[in-house]
Amino acid sequence: MSVSAAPAIPQYSVSDYMKFALAGAIGCGSTHSSMVPIDVVKTRIQLEPTVYNKGMVGSFKQIIAGEGAGALLTGFGPTLLGYSIQGAFKFGGYEVFKKFFIDNLGYDTASRYKNSVYMGSAAMAEFLADIALCPLEATRIRLVSQPQFANGLVGGFSRILKEEGIGSFYSGFTPILFKQIPYNIAKFLVFERASEFYYGFAGPKEKLSSTSTTLLNLLSGLTAGLAAAIVSQPADTLLSKVNKTKKAPGQSTVGLLAQLAKQLGFFGSFAGLPTRLVMVGTLTSLQFGIYGSLKSTLGCPPTIEIGGGGH
């Protein structure tokens, strides 16, 4: 569709952005915490592929047999809290930055370069989200990889802080950025374009039922999740390794990353991909489904849709 007269751009209040953030927090927090058992298996496969080498189902059985079913909920606390905070920044921030770019570029220019608007908005929102997420993600990975390390979120967080200092929470910040920023760019870019594609067949959004809209959000989210999982898988594996490995004296984070990347190799960096495709595809689909439904429930104004083919 060619760019036509610019539609009226909604003006959001602080309250509106808070509603976007709340919807994102609930969507991300609930979905990530519900996937904790799968994430425990994925992380174990990444960290100890020679031990957990029987695939997803076999590794589930192996963990339950060796440690009990409760081991599959390891890291639930930091996952729920961390990803709720991240979701608030991720979705709320995306709306903030998309509005910022449209206001400053003008609607016509934003329409011509909408892929860049989507990508820039997603990247900036994710950077802020990762600052908040990093300490809790480091704690989660430590609890999953070392089940005897501490008893829950508070114990794990306190022990890391006491024994290794606050800087250790951000030892994985660089790989988190390498993982999450490409992931979030792919997630929102593919979701936006997939939505355009699917709505092109289904018809105008305003003429569809709420059930149809939710189903299209779920389908677009699934498409986005599969793409995002593949793009970010090598950095996800590297992140798991970084949070388990202590740096040698004088070794920089970049040096440790290079060392671990060399050890993993190309195929090793994709360890656990099938499991992660299931997990990320499912949770991304649910996130966008929940986010869309909650925006309606909370009385959020409509998000800005950018027309045109875009670059």
UniProtKB/Swiss-Prot annotation:
What is this protein's function per UniProt?
Transport of phosphate groups from the cytosol to the mitochondrial matrix.
Which residue ranges does the entry give as Mitochondrial matrix-facing topology? 41-62, 137-165, 236-253
Task: Please give the organism.
Answer: Saccharomyces cerevisiae (strain ATCC 204508 / S288c)
Does the UniProt entry include the keyword Methyltransferase?
A: no
**UniProt cross-references to InterPro entries, sorted A to Z:** Mit_carrier, Mitochondrial_sb/sol_carrier, Mt_carrier_dom_sf, SLC25A3/Pic2/Mir1-like
Sorted alphabetically, the keyword list is: Acetylation, Membrane, Mitochondrion, Mitochondrion inner membrane, Phosphoprotein, Repeat, Transmembrane, Transmembrane helix, Transport
Q: Where are the Solcar repeats?
A: 15-100, 114-197, 212-297
State the name under which the record lists this protein: Mitochondrial phosphate carrier protein
Topology: which residues are Mitochondrial intermembrane?
Answer: 1-19, 84-115, 187-214, 275-311
In what way does this protein cross or attach to the membrane? Multi-pass membrane protein
Q: Name one GO biological process term.
A: mitochondrial phosphate ion transmembrane transport
**Do you know which PROSITE patterns this protein is assigned to?**
SOLCAR
Checking Gene3D superfamilies in the record gives:
Mitochondrial carrier domain
One GO term in the molecular function aspect is:
phosphate transmembrane transporter activity
Report the superkingdom from the record. Eukaryota
Show the SUPFAM superfamilies listed in the entry.
Answer: Mitochondrial carrier (SSF103506)
Quick check: keyword Transferase in the entry? no
**Pfam families assigned:** Mito_carr
Post-translational modification Phosphoserine, affected residues: 4, 145
Gene (UniProt): MIR1
Task: List locations, semicolon-separated.
Answer: Mitochondrion inner membrane
Enumerate the transmembrane spans.
20-40, 63-83, 116-136, 166-186, 215-235, 254-274
Q: Provide the family line.
A: Belongs to the mitochondrial carrier (TC 2.A.29) family.
